[in-house]
Regions:
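Extreme N-terminus nucleophile/cap motif
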Residues: 1-59, 200, 241-243, 249-258
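Conserved beta-strand-loop-short alpha-helix elements that form
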Residues: 2, 103-113
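Residue-level signal for inorganic ion chemistry
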Residues: 38, 109, 132
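Short acidic (Asp/Glu) patches
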Residues: 52-64, 78-100, 117-119
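Catalytic core of PPM/PP2C metal-dependent serine/threonine phosphatase domains
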Residues: 73, 146-186
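Glycine-rich phosphate-binding loop plus the immediately following alpha-helix
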Residues: 113-115, 120-143
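Gly/Ser/Thr-rich active-site loops/lids in small-molecule metabolic enzymes
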Residues: 128, 186-209
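A conserved acidic, glycine/proline-rich C-terminal tail/linker
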Residues: 199-242
Length: 258
């Protein structure tokens, strides 16, 4: 299985701390050696870093850790390959344009007997994850030829994710840069940090950060991960079928499918 990392914040925030913890699981404290990627939204633009190498040994990952890019929405992923060979084209997150915005997607899990819709969006690589992403966007494009608010889109997103979940394991993160959507099939956890901030210690490497010194009293930052990244904070675990929608660090909608 792979691992996911997402962030939604009300101010541009760097994710170096959480990213540093996740990267250790890419071959050092975890088995996810088959590539990694992370996407940072900057307005309507997107910075995407990917490498099919193990993240714990990747010079590109080292660059990202040394370069604290600030963003309000981030999606990251480390891969343990199930479907598709280890190569750059199979490395998450995947990105496509829809309605003049960059949509970004990362998936943890595996789908069986999945036949995607063949339409406008087509995979570049050969993973079931990218096929599901293209299938999802084709559904959205067919149902809504013109842009709509995410609140109008939510029922279609949730229904599609529930359908994918019925074919295997489908934990995912999805964003267009304004919002962050999360769906849990088996494993996801979240933490929202707000004032009063305190110190946090990573599980996978001996690193501590004092968020009090790094933030302002008005900052709200939510981090979503497959497994909790810190050992001294209380994370909330999702239940199977649970989904949530985040904007500016706050949960604006949530629910659960059967």
């Amino acid at each position: 299985m792979c691992e996911l990392l997402g962030m939604s914040a009300n101010v541009p925030t760097d994710i170096v701390f959480s990213f540093t913890g996740l990267m250790q699981r890419g071959g050092r404290t975890g088995p996810h050696r088959d590539g990694w990627g992370i996407a940072f939204y900057e307005g309507r633009g997107l910075r995407l870093f990917q490498d099919p190498a193990a993240s714990c040994e990747s010079e590109v990952a080292n660059l990202v850790q040394r370069y604290p890019i600030k963003s309000e929405v981030v999606i990251g992923h480390i891969r343990q390959a199930n479907v598709g060979k280890v190569c750059l084209s199979n490395t998450h997150p995947f990105v496509r344009e829809l309605w003049g915005r960059n949509w970004c997607f990362a998936h943890n899990g595996q789908l069986a007997d999945f036949t995607p819709i063949k339409s406008f969006y087509r995979p570049v690589g050969d993973t079931d994850s990218e096929a599901a992403f293209c299938d999802l966007l084709n559904r959205v494009r067919a149902a809504f030829p013109e842009p709509v608010d995410v609140e109008a889109l939510l029922p279609d997103l949730v229904a599609a994710c529930a359908e994918y979940r019925s074919k295997g394991v489908f934990n995912c993160l999805l964003s267009d840069g304004d919002w962050l959507f999360c769906y849990c099939s088996t494993k996801l956890a979240q933490i929202t940090r707000r004032a009063p901030f305190g110190p946090a210690r990573l599980k996978d490497v001996d690193v501590i950060v004092d968020f009090q010194a790094e933030t302002t009293p008005n900052d709200v930052v939510t981090v979503i991960a497959t497994e909790p990244l810190t050992e001294n904070e209380t994370w909330t675990r999702y239940e199977p079928g649970q989904w949530s929608l985040w904007r500016r660090g706050e949960c604006v909608s949530q629910g659960k499918t059967e």
